[in-house]
Amino acid sequence: MNKLRTNYLISYLKKVVLFVVVLALTVCLTGCEEQDELVLRVYSWEDYIDDGTDDNGIKIGNSVMEDFEEWYFEKYGVKVIVEYDTFATNEVMMNTLKTGKTSYDLICPSDYTIQKMIGNSPEENMLEEFDYTLRDQNGDLIIDNYKYLSPYLRNLFEEKGWDKYSIPYMWGTLGLIYNPEVVDHEDAKHWNILWDEKYKNQATAKDSVRDTYVIGVMEVYYDELMELREKYLNNEISQKEYSAHVQEIMNRCDDPNDPTEPGGTLEKIERALKDMKNNLYGFEVDNGKSDIVTGKIAINFAWSGDAVYSLDTAEYDNEEEPVYLYYSVPEEGSNVWFDGWVMPKGANKKLAQSFVNYLCSPEMAVRNMSFIGYTSGIIGDEVLDMINEWYGVLPYYYEDEEDPESTGWYFDGEILDIDYSADAEPKIIPNSNGENLYDIYINDTLIEEEVECYEVSLNHYFENADQEILDSIKPRYLKDGKVTVYVWERDRQFDTQYPSMEVLARCAIMEDFGIQNNAVMDMWENVKIGDIPFSITILVLGLLTLCLGALYTKRFMKARQKAKRRKIIE
């Protein structure tokens, strides 16, 4: 009997051990499956990354997401699927997150929304921190390409403390696109052109309180801003002091120290924007960038990325009659804006940071800039090559694997009949016959003489950059040790994408309205609705009186009819 019990116990224990082993293997295999296939959920703006399609939406190659999936598998041996969703506004994105129905690893909001997501306390913070020291299993830094971020942009983020929670993706300015055949260049240097009756019904502004608020605050504090500009240009204040003053003015939402103006800043801006509205063709969300190309309007208040689109389209889509539009950041000042990558709480940090690192490579930055027309915060030799190919006068080498006859050195859009390898070095030398005249060489061969072009410093984007980046810059982009390019023209596409330090000094980040948000929104609704004329008020009251009178008469007649019927019945 004891033997039977012992055998039963041994059999039972074997089954238990087998069950535990199977369970452990199942868990391990499940874990391996999860490790072998990761999902990265990304939420960003529409048309804000190279999706592998042409201008007609036809698939012509891999998207950036597909290439990242391949790169990640080659590097780590793990399959990744990138699920890429898009939103139209920051507010739509925030509402989606609040529902809690969908979670994301990576989101690309605008600067003021990043500020909202960080919040004012740990309890309000919606974001994970980036770990710039995190390394992968190979010992490589996960966010190694952060070194390519322009120190200018990096400093702006670090000053706000945003660098812990966000890495810039694209950035730009707000300004005015204008047609010089209709608009005087001098007039376009100031925001008050939008109030100028000379251009009545020829300009549009954004149907966005945040963007159009910039115009209002710049107009209201015109004198103060121009005085600051004068001090900066006369070296009475530093660039940092100047930018700080502009920042403070741009973010004014009230003015309690001014007893002569009821309501302070908001009251002044409301009056100014109402006057401006009466002079505009109208407010728009996205049509303005096309309307200025077709000639429907002559001035469009725009983001710099949309400005590049408009300038390119007007110039190149109508070869018979090209229109050469310009872009201006008015002298009073403007907004410098950013869209940056953030990781919501609970994100797969390692995978999300790997994707951001991939996007921060100069190669990917150039690729995405080429696709969407906006400006990346990434710098490097590849970016300088792109700038020169798009806007510069120096010859560049182009290699076409599919068409060897198209491979070679190009100047001013034409292939050169010279037998130099890609290692040859272009040079530019001032010509003594006039200002802005230069002679162009490749090695010692003269390519063109007396070329009219402009020398432009880009050193403010590279100053204090990683030494590895500075050492990689080709000699053709350096003058006296400073990063310099030579471009065909000014105040058009090149300056739209890469403003000078003088322009950037008068641009500031617009912060969240905070506790004044409702007051600002009320002000904006008042601007859009406008003041109702007295004659309209009388007309509305008259119609209301007639309607009420008719309603009363109808009810009175019904009551009399009922009374008559009761008498008849009785």
Regions found by a protein language model. Name each.
Residues 27-31:
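C-terminal motif of bacterial Sec signal peptides marking the signal peptidase cleavage site
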Residues 34-120, 141:
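Early extracytoplasmic/lumenal segment of secretory-pathway proteins
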Residues 43-61, 110-296, 310-313:
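Extracytoplasmic ligand-binding site segments that recognize negatively charged/polar headgroups
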Residues 278-346, 386, 390-397:
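Extracytoplasmic/periplasmic substrate-binding proteins
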Residues 339-498:
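Mature extracytoplasmic/periplasmic domains
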Residues 527-544:
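Juxtamembrane/start-of-transmembrane alpha-helix segments at the extracytoplasmic/lumenal side
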Residues 544-558:
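Alpha-helical transmembrane segments
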Residues 558-570:
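Cytoplasmic C-terminal tails of single-pass
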